[in-house]
Amino acid sequence: MFQGAAALSLDAKGRLTVPSRHREALQATSLPAASSLVLTAHPDGCLLLYPAKAWEPIRARVMAFPALDARFSVWKRLLVGFAEEVEIDAAWRVLISPELRKFASLEKPVMLVGQGSHFEIWNQDTWEKQLRQLTAQTQLPPGMEDFAL
């Protein structure tokens, strides 16, 4: 399970180094191909990073969307159209393509945010803006009325 947020820096080639605290979990969820990941775009403006095994059922569901329904087409274009298989190198770095970096406005400072089965990768400024908006909300979304910490 991937959880927690980490402020990271992309190198000059657009590579992101996976923090050591996530490496063991990544290996456990990705076996036998621990180095095989999928990067794709999310409509909120971030990137999604999935172990290939976790991505496959999502890709299959998206591909089953009705082809001629415009409401589904945008999701297919983003999730499948931007999807790229990436490998983790020996130094635990993931290369983010120029197209995906442009989509998410990624610069050197980025945020890697664990989401259980996958990670989100955010432009640091966009992430901070999202957090401010979230903490300014006073109402819980439907279904969370009984949620307590």
For the regions a language model picked out, list residue spans one by one.
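A positional/architectural concept
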Residues: Q3-G45
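Short, structured motif recognition centered on aromatic/hydrophobic residues
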Residues: G14-V18, Y50, W92-I96, L100, ...
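Short, charged/polar, Gly/Pro-enriched secondary-structure boundary elements
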Residues: A25-L26, P57-I58, W127-L131
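Residue-level signal for well-ordered alpha-helical positions
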Residues: A28-S30, R61, E107, Q133-L134
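A short beta-strand-loop micro-motif that forms or neighbors metal/cofactor-
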Residues: T29-G45, S105-W122, T126, Q139
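Helix-adjacent hinge/juxtasegments
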Residues: L47-E85
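Beta-rich strand-turn-strand
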Residues: E84-R93, P98-E107
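Short, Lys/Arg-rich amphipathic alpha-helical interaction segments
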Residues: D125-L149
